[in-house]
Amino acid sequence: MDPGAGSETSLTVNEQVIVMSGHETIRVLEVGVDAQLPAEEESKGLEGVAAEGSQSGDPAEASQAAGEAGPDNLGSSAEATVKSPPGIPPSPATAIATFSQAPSQPQASQTLTPLAVQAAPQVLTQENLATVLTGVMVPAGAVTQPLLIPISIAGQVAGQQGLAVWTIPTATVAALPGLTAASPTGGVFKPPLAGLQAAAVLNTALPAPVQAAAPVQASSTAQPRPPAQPQTLFQTQPLLQTTPAILPQPTAATAAAPTPKPVDTPPQITVQPAGFAFSPGIISAASLGGQTQILGSLTTAPVITSAIPSMPGISSQILTNAQGQVIGTLPWVVNSASVAAPAPAQSLQVQAVTPQLLLNAQGQVIATLASSPLPPPVAVRKPSTPESPAKSEVQPIQPTPTVPQPAVVIASPAPAAKPSASAPIPITCSETPTVSQLVSKPHTPSLDEDGINLEEIREFAKNFKIRRLSLGLTQTQVGQALTATEGPAYSQSAICRFEKLDITPKSAQKLKPVLEKWLNEAELRNQEGQQNLMEFVGGEPSKKRKRRTSFTPQAIEALNAYFEKNPLPTGQEITEIAKELNYDREVVRVWFCNRRQTLKNTSKLNVFQIP
């Protein structure tokens, strides 16, 4: 930021960067909140510290000297210590930063945040999400709810990519003095003067000495900056907004085409009496291949720009790298449901979605994050889009930025035109409709096109069954008697279908007189006596069923052995097996038939079984 921008005392964040040269790398990067500092003095302070560090041979001593030189330039008390074991090169390690925050009250003298760094981490990687740098704003005696903002430090920093997470509680406006949004041209987000203190530690093995440029006031000797071009601290760029949730795929769903990149938009920040909510940002770190800039601009992805009282406040944030590729998603929290807030615009409806998918750089799902016990994910429909129900789109994850939206919008396809309820639905059947179908149809005349009285046939079938049962006759007995006298067309199956009216009108018309004549004669015989009825039906009673044959275990074993040798034996072989086992030949033949059928059924089942 140029000196002109740094002249705003109450809204400026001054950062003190201490850089070590030589074979060592950046040791400490302190971020403090202080009054304005002239660009010339800070530049001299940075250069002096860098020169002093380059002359020092011991990395620990140089870091200690740098830690002492930083607070002198700022005119306040702070302490920063670096613990580096001797003989250990600055390989990738875990950075541990501790912070202590003074009460957010106006003070004459600003105090810096004490910072303690252990070892020499190379970069904050995705695997070290636990190593995060947290700046806390806690007003005295206030109970706050944190606002988790996922931050992606992208770019190739020594061949790795870093992540950091800021935790900022949703305090009230009274505890957030100076929280404003700058003009759209500047695009600067200015935190309160005494409310936010944070630090970031980056270590990378570079072949040449590198000086770090602070995000607030960059001072570099290797790469001068034109004075007319101020460095923006927080730059807003619309990013890809895709809620990482499992959405119902419509039948006619089509993938949305990539949209052109829109122009930069100003930050969307909403300050409300009970809390504040602003869009999470993504930090872009420039490639350090010989460059002097460590941290670039902070771009925000507008996800929810206003507190919504009807939403529990759980959503997700997409993490991208410098190339715009999605590397992960994390949940972030806004105001709770109990916080009263004004109703949002009618066109903004956000539904919290869970679970969330964690993607890697290749777009593969590697994990899921369940942020809260919410109902299953549902698609949210914007009220402004019902006029185009023919479109049904699901926005895919794309590396190119697109226009941010409050939620994934799915316009349901138009329902198919339903036929009018009053219009009759004709029965289209490839076969001739049966009597039951014709009789059950409403508004069906009693006579069909052939002059057959369907109602009369239905009544006769019902009475025929009652009279048959009163005589104690079965359908099989009636079928056998009629088959013997009238032919095979009057079998037991024909009697069954006639009683159920599962027969065509013509067939029913043909069966009706024959059945009526036979039933009348059977009733006359029954009046003469049961014996006469049995003689008329076909006389002798049915034989008892043969007792089921039971095989001994030895016989079953022998039959299985024969079956394994030859599943289909000849008649002579069956006779020999029956004599050997002392069983009837017919019993052995039936056993082989049943065994083959069982094997066939088992094979069919195996075909459909899921491996």
UniProtKB/Swiss-Prot annotation:
TM stretches of this protein = none
Q: Where in the cell is it found?
A: Nucleus
Q: List the disulfide bonds.
A: none
State the residue spans of region: Disordered. 62-93
InterPro entries tied to this protein = HD, Homeodomain-like_sf, Lambda_DNA-bd_dom_sf, POU, POU_dom, POU_domain_TF
- For this UniProt record, give its keywords in alphabetical order, as a comma-separated list: DNA-binding, Homeobox, Nucleus, Transcription, Transcription regulation
Where expressed (tissues)?
A: In the embryo, expressed exclusively in the developing brain, whereas in the adult its expression is restricted to brain, heart, skeletal muscle and lung. In the brain, the highest expression levels are found in specific cell layers of the cortex, the olfactory bulb, the hippocampus and the cerebellum.
Point out the DNA-binding stretch(es).
Answer: 544-603
Give the superkingdom in one word: Eukaryota
User: Could you state a single Gene Ontology molecular function term?
Assistant: RNA polymerase II cis-regulatory region sequence-specific DNA binding
The UniProt function text for this chain reads: Transcription factor that binds preferentially to a variant of the octamer motif (5'-ATGATAAT-3').
Family the entry assigns: Belongs to the POU transcription factor family. Class-6 subfamily.
Q: What is this protein called?
A: POU domain, class 6, transcription factor 1
Origin species = Homo sapiens (Human)
> Species lineage, top-down?
Eukaryota, Metazoa, Chordata, Craniata, Vertebrata
